[in-house]
Amino acid sequence: MNEVRYYQKNIMIVDDDPDIVLSLQELFEREGFQVTTAENGRTCLVELEKGFQGIIILDLMMPIMDGIETIKKMTIDGFTDENTIIVLTAKRIQGEEFNEIYPYIADYITKPFDISTLLNTVKKIAQKPPVKRRY
């Protein structure tokens, strides 16, 4: 049986809902991923400054620093070059606000979400070697 190879094994879950964070952490750890968590954008940036590289599952509606502001700051600091962002949020955005973040995200999944859709999205991304992107 062929074992699936994951090039990106690190996942950061950035969400202020502890139930979602715990559920996703347990799911991805069972799948063999190393999971880091952050309760808002500011904490996410701290983890990135410590050297986190991988897949970031990011909510847009959070206190202290929301997801859109986090993506903007990640772009300025160069963190979008080596990390893959999946937006997972109840916030529906469009127009200019969406256009600002679209170039930097791999997928946009709305809450409530199907767990298998998120898991399959993460697995597809993780199976690809990381690409250093320049925007």
Where does each model-flagged region fall?
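Non-catalytic signal-transmission and effector/linker regions of two-component phosphorelay proteins
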Residues: 1-12, 116-135
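Charged docking surfaces used in two-component/phosphorelay signaling
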Residues: 22-30
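Helix N-cap/capping motif at the beta->alpha junctions
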Residues: 37-46, 67
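Short amphipathic alpha-helix used as the core "switch/output" element in two-component signaling
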Residues: 46, 68-81
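Active-site beta3 strand of CheY-like receiver
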Residues: 52-57
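Receiver (REC) domain active-site loop signature in two-component systems and cognate sites
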Residues: 62
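Alpha4 helix (beta4-alpha4-beta5 surface) of REC/receiver domains from two-component response regulators
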Residues: 69, 81, 92-109, 116, ...
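Hydrophobic/aromatic residues positioned on beta-strands within the core alpha/beta folds
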Residues: 88-89
